[in-house]
């Protein structure tokens, strides 16, 4: 494919064209030329759009799709099409499928299903067999098959010794462990953040302590073993402080935060709407502000949509019984623009590649074209009728947004929303 993207503002600090409005000429997979008023050519398609911006392709570090096993929630093909039209050229795929992605053949299955699609999929292998927290999965074999990290999605590694052994073992092949932090004993039967809102609604609460105890424990283990650790979707003030302190001590720890935890609070729960039932739970505004500060000072390395499609049968039920999760790919950018400056959003939507040791390409002549196209001034409402995901469980339903992904260019393919 040959295209010329017209008058796009480049948002890429690693590029000499950062913050400049230019034309970008692309021949198949390579950026051929960047400059003003590039001459039209008969065999080049031209892309024109008001308020057009261009950045390195966005990468989401936590996406669940369902397939294999839960295709009623989402398929790989449709899910990656949704990702592309939401601006993501790459996603890290969680292992919470059926069967769990805990061996070489399951990793290969996912890659084979996705290799012809424009958005790249990078599987995360389960840390333990069947994500049951008892025995290590086939970590080395999965690494050789393309797994970029290991984690049991939404489940803490409760066995401290197992995490210690894992942290030591994967150093032999320079791999990364993802450790979700929530002490199940402290959480108990809690379903929302413990606080004024949970008391008012009569719902059982999950104290911040449930997360913070596990964060502190895992950081102690990392200090003992060395190696690298990624802590996903943190949600509390103290978690930010603990990770900031660990980084200052020189520990190789990275972390992420989910879009909904940056934008929403537990005040949304007043209507008992299960769309707001997520894990970790929506916290207070005090925590939300601490998370934003953590993003701004780079304590928090990446922002994820934590996209988790859930079918209506498991959402439209009593709050205590409903499953956790919200879809997030389609609303991520528009929601983030309400709380963060543009440059920081793009930074945090592209930084995940470095954490997972994936190649990134500056916007420069001769480089691979892995690009996201977006606007910042497009007013729109995230309505159910416009959702492309098979599941509609969005915490941002009917939210007014400003700014939207237009599409991507990756692997010689243009996908427009």
Residues of each region from the PLM?
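N-terminal metal-binding scaffold of metallo-dependent hydrolase/deaminase domains
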Residues: 1-41, 413-414
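Divalent metal-coordination and catalytic microenvironments
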Residues: 8, 29, 51, 62, ...
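Acidic, glycine-enriched loop/beta-strand segments at the rims
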Residues: 11-23, 354-385
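Active-site metal-binding motif and surrounding structural segment of the metallo-beta-lactamase
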Residues: 38-54
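Metal-associated gating/positioning segment near the N- to mid-region
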Residues: 49-114
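Histidine/acidic residue-rich metal-binding segments in metalloenzymes
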Residues: 137-303
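His/Asp/Glu-enriched, well-ordered alpha-helical/loop segment
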Residues: 200-226, 297-374
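C-terminal cap of metal-dependent C-N hydrolases
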Residues: 321, 368-417
């Amino acid at each position: 494919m040959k295209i010329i993207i017209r008058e796009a503002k480049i948002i890429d600090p690693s590029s000499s064209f950062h913050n400049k409005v230019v034309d970008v000429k692309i021949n198949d997979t390579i950026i051929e030329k960047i400059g003003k008023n590039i001459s039209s050519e008969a065999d080049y398609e031209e892309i024109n759009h008001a308020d057009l911006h261009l950045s390195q392709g966005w990468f989401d570090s936590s996406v669940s799709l369902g397939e294999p096993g839960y295709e009623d929630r989402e398929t790989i093909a449709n899910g990656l099409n949704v990702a592309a039209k939401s601006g993501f050229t790459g996603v890290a795929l969680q292992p919470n499928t059926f069967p769990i992605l805990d061996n070489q053949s399951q990793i290969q299955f996912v890659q084979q299903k996705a290799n012809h699609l424009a958005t790249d999929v990078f599987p995360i292998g389960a840390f333990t067999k069947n994500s049951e927290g008892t025995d290590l999965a086939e970590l080395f074999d999965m690494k050789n098959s393309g797994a970029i990290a290991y984690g049991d999605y939404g489940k803490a590694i409760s066995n401290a010794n197992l995490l210690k052994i894992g942290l030591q073992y994967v150093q032999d092949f320079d791999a990364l462990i993802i450790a979700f932090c929530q002490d199940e004993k402290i959480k108990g039967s809690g379903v929302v953040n413990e606080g004024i809102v949970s008391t008012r609604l009569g719902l059982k609460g999950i104290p911040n302590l449930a997360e913070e105890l596990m964060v502190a424990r895992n950081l102690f283990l990392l200090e003992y073993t060395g190696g690298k650790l990624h802590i996903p979707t943190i949600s509390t003030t103290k978690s930010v402080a603990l990770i900031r302190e660990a980084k200052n001590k020189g520990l190789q720890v990275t972390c992420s935060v989910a879009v909904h935890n940056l934008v929403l609070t537990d005040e949304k729960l007043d209507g008992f709407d299960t769309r707001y039932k997520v894990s970790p739970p929506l916290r207070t505004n005090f925590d939300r502000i601490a998370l934003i500060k953590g993003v701004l000072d780079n304590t928090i390395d990446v922002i994820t949509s934590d996209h988790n499609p859930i079918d209506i049968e498991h959402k439209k039920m009593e709050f205590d019984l409903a499953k956790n999760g919200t879809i997030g790919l389609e609303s991520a950018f528009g929601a983030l623009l309400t709380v963060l400056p543009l440059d920081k959003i793009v930074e945090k939507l592209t930084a995940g590649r470095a954490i997972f040791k994936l190649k990134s390409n500056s916007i420069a002549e001769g480089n691979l074209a892995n690009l996201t196209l977006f606007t910042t001034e497009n007013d729109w409402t995230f309505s159910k009728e416009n959702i492309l995901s098979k599941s509609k469980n969005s915490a941002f339903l009917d939210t007014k947004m400003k700014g939207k992904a237009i599409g991507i260019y990756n692997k010689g393919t243009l996908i427009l929303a």
